[in-house]
Curated annotation (Swiss-Prot):
One Pfam family, short name: V_ATPase_I
Disruption phenotype: Cells show defects in V-ATPase enzyme assembly, endocytic function and cytosolic pH regulation.
Residue ranges annotated as Vacuolar topological domain: 422-423, 485-530, 593-639, 732-749
Main localisation: membrane
Protein name listed in UniProt: Vacuolar proton translocating ATPase 100 kDa subunit
Membrane topology: Multi-pass membrane protein
Taxonomic lineage of the native organism: Eukaryota, Amoebozoa, Evosea, Eumycetozoa, Dictyostelia
Length: 815
């Protein structure tokens, strides 16, 4: 398994390689290397404008083809039945063997045909819409004129232009009885514009108009967007030519379609019959046009994604070739890139395959070159370890050959989550969720998922381990939905005389975790708080100590005398400082646990307190402790305090002095011409290769680093108390939900209330504990690893290894 390989502890050893590829074999060579995904090419033309590179025309050509494919895909997605036939991703489609010239010609033909069909269909749809709207205008107007026959057929009468044509209290029938002949404009507009349209008419005509409207029941299809639009028929009555021109302009500004409607009922009836016949004929033509378009798109669908895959890979190949240097004399391309050392043979095999495939007479050549640049960082992961590696990478990419925190994170991250979320019941529900995601792995892998589903699916194995550790720690806490599990039988008996619980066997305890009798005891919180708080301190000291040990592994990987200096002036004093104070406190905690200071015998004494002991260690060094854990405690505490204090100047002063000495020795070697390679490595690490050595800058940096560690040792240890705080919050919330929501309803004896209470309890547990509380525990575990653990050793200033890979390119495009 990959997590047992050395490449997961440290990044894979990388090698800079140089490729000499004949121009006729370049395309096939890049294609074969893309299938491997083992080389990260460098840009040898970074000072050349993108539009002046050798293969820019080929890239533009691929861009044009991609635009046409995007046009085809948009047309297909407008047809729901055809859209269902599209594959989920391009990785699963079969490669297309067609040549680019052939595809380009095919795309031009299809694009021209589809655009012509769309133009014809848009014209037909617009004409069809016009006829549909005219039919509704004739129908609605006929109904209105039948209700008011005298409105446009009466004799003209004088009417003041200064007063409204229709006052608010004057109905249209009254106007008809007066025999006033009015002009009218009728048309159709979007329904959502009608209120504003009517207000504009009223203000412009000063009320000298009358508007009648009716909603068209069927939806009108917009010929440009293809979406259905709600339309309304309107008719505006007015008096005078000047108002007619104003009303027409308002109608045009609102995008209304105006129709000439005869004022004679016989003419309206004849026109309606003609329009109905034309609608029937045009509908048949429109359907044939749509069928032709569907047939054209149906021929595109099976090959669309294979075409997209072909064009996308071709574009990536030419884009990669633009990174290469072109040797005009040799007519070859020269490429540089990083690759893992153990993969060079696979690359050479791919080069030979590409040479044979292209028919080139001169084989491609791979040469290994040396460089002072820092290589990219590459860790070999699988689907199980990749999620944990991404957790680390989110903080920062490891420096080249730096110890990888993900090795320990695979275990410690879910474990610390379990410490905060420890509950057998909730952990089991979380486990079911994780197993469900894992079981759907093959079905969901590679598909486009909702963001809320994608995140837990990507972290399904992290979720799986978190649930297992939650169950494990839940057994330690002896909590299942906040209630204890008396699996092995309590070790306490109730003494009927004293009314107190006593041990059945003084030489034996509850086999696994906390005795169930502690749950519900008067001093339950006191006991659990003490246990979890001390446990948090121990976990914190141990994890920070492992972090300092990881820094030792980083120092051992260095070359030259700086290795010994870092070990003696960084690792040793840091470990001494941490364990002289907080390590000693952890030892006292364990000592207090294992030593039977108090029993139910009269002659036993109360256990000593740890906090006053640590405070007295600093305030009264060398004095006799008031609280004694063991003989010779005063001398031990004095020695530990001395070691902690002396370690600070060791971290602060000694390393800058050694670095200054190494710098002068390096200068002398350069003068004598004996500058060895390991000193290049040393200078690379110290950051002063080819730079003037500044003692003040180095000393200030060391002061900052020392202060950060000393203060961080205190604050980081206190930060681990969040393990206790979140565990307490989870336990108390779970207990409240159980007792108040579920048990409170069950005790009422009403089955319906019990059912409702169970539903409310389950909903609250899922929403608050499984979602909100688990997210909170996840974020706190993330903080403990990124800050408290990784700042002891992790530089995190590396560069990710991103090789040219066809699989990665296709996957990113699918996203």
């Amino acid at each position: 398994m990959s997590f047992l390989r050395p490449s997961i502890w440290r990044s894979s050893p990388m090698q800079m390689v140089q490729l000499f590829v004949q121009i006729e074999a370049a395309h096939d060579t890049v294609d074969e290397l893309g299938k491997l995904g083992l080389i990260q090419f460098l840009d040898d033309n970074e000072h050349v404008n993108l539009f002046q590179r050798n293969f820019v025309n080929e890239v533009k050509r691929c861009d044009d083809m991609e635009k046409k494919l995007k046009f085809f895909e948009d047309q297909v997605k407008k047809e729901p039945k055809l859209q269902k036939l599209l594959p989920d991703n391009m990785l699963s489609v079969v490669d297309d063997d067609s040549q680019m010239d052939e595809l380009e010609g095919r795309f031009d033909e299809l694009e021209s045909e589809l655009k012509q069909v769309n133009a014809n269909q848009e014209t037909l749809q617009r004409n069809y819409n016009e006829l549909i709207q005219l039919r509704h205008v004739l129908t609605k107007d006929s109904v209105f004129f039948q209700e008011n026959p005298n409105l446009i057929e009466g004799e003209g009468h004088e009417h003041s232009a200064r007063s409204p044509l229709l006052a608010e209290d004057q109905h249209v029938s009254e106007v008809a009885k007066q025999g006033v002949k009015l002009g009218f404009i009728t048309g159709v507009m979007n329904t959502d514009k009608m209120p504003q349209f009517q207000r504009s008419l009223w203000r412009t005509t000063r009320g000298n108009n009358y508007v009648k409207d009716a909603r068209i029941e069927e939806e009108i299809i917009d010929p440009q967007t293809g979406e259905e639009t709600a339309k309304t028929v309107f008719i505006v009555f007015f008096q005078g030519e000047r108002l007619q021109q104003k009303i027409k302009k308002i109608c045009e500004s609102f995008g209304a379609n105006i129709y000439d409607c005869p004022d004679n009922s016989f003419e309206r009836s004849n026109l309606l019959q003609k329009v109905t016949v034309r609608i029937t004929d045009l509908y048949e033509v429109l359907q044939r046009s749509k069928d032709h378009k569907r047939q054209t798109l149906a021929g595109i669908v099976p090959r669309l994604y294979s075409w997209k895959k072909k064009v996308l890979l071709e574009k990536s190949i030419y884009h990669t070739m633009n990174l290469f240097d072109y040797d005009v004399g040799r007519k070859c391309l020269i490429a540089k890139g990083w690759t893992p050392k153990d993969k060079i043979e696979e690359i050479q095999l791919a080069l030979r395959t590409a040479t044979t495939r292209s028919g080139a007479l001169v084989p491609s050549v791979l040469s290994i070159i040396k460089t002072e640049g820092s290589p990219p960082t590459h860790f070999e992961t699988n689907k199980y370890t990749s999620s944990f590696q991404e957790i680390v990478n989110a903080y920062g990419i490891a420096h080249y050959r730096e110890v990888n925190p993900a090795v320990l994170t695979i275990v410690t991250f879910p474990f610390l989550f379990g410490v905060m979320f420890g509950d057998v019941g909730h952990g089991a529900l979380l486990l079911l969720s994780a197993l469900g995601l894992i079981s759907l792995e093959k079905k969901l892998a590679g598909k486009k998922l909702n963001e809320l589903i994608q995140m837990p699916f990507d972290g399904r194995y992290v979720l799986f381990l978190m649930s297992l550790f939650s169950i494990y720690v839940g057994f330690i806490y002896n909590e299942c939905f906040s209630i204890p599990m008396n699996i092995f039988g309590s070790q306490y008996n109730l003494n009927s005389t004293t009314g107190l619980y006593t041990y059945q066997h003084t030489d034996r305890v509850y086999p696994v975790g906390v005795d169930p009798l502690w749950k519900g005891a008067p001093n339950e919180l006191v006991y659990y708080n003490s246990f979890k708080m001390k446990l948090s301190i121990i976990f914190g000291v141990v994890q920070m100590s492992v972090g300092i040990c990881f820094s030792l592994l980083n120092y051992l990987n260095q070359k030259g005398p700086i290795k010994i200096v870092n070990i003696l002036t960084q690792f040793v004093p840091q470990m001494i400082f941490l364990w002289s104070i907080f390590g000693y406190m952890s030892v006292l905690i364990i000592l207090k646990w294992v030593v039977p200071y108090r029993s139910f015998e009269v002659d036993k004494v109360d256990p000593p307190f740890i906090l006053p002991t640590i405070i007295a260690m600093f305030l009264s060094p060398g004095g006799t402790p008031d609280v004694v854990f063991f003989s010779g405690q005063g001398a031990v505490q004095t020695a530990l305090l001395f070691l902690a204090l002396i370690s600070i100047p060791v971290m602060l002063v000694i390393k800058p002095l050694f670095m200054k000495r190494f710098h002068f020795q390096e200068v002398e070697r350069k003068k004598l011409g004996h500058h060895e390679e390991e000193h290049d490595d040393e200078a690379l690490y110290t950051g002063h290769h080819g730079e003037e050595f500044e003692m003040g800058e180095v000393f200030v940096h060391q002061v900052i680093h020392t202060i950060e560690f000393v203060l961080g040792a205190v604050s980081n240890t206190a930060s681990y108390l969040r393990l206790w705080a979140l565990s307490l919050a989870h336990s108390e919330l779970s207990s409240v939900f159980w007792e108040r929501i579920l048990i409170g309803q069950v005790e009422r004896g009403n089955p319906f209330l019990a059912f409702v209470g169970f539903g409310a309890w389950l909903g609250a547990s899922v929403a608050v504990l499984l979602l909100m509380e688990s997210l909170s525990a996840f974020l706190h575990a993330l903080r403990l690893h990124w800050v408290e653990f990784q700042n002891k050793f992790y530089i995190g200033d590396g560069v990710r290894f991103i090789p040219y890979s066809a699989t990665r390119i296709l996957s990113e495009d699918d996203e």
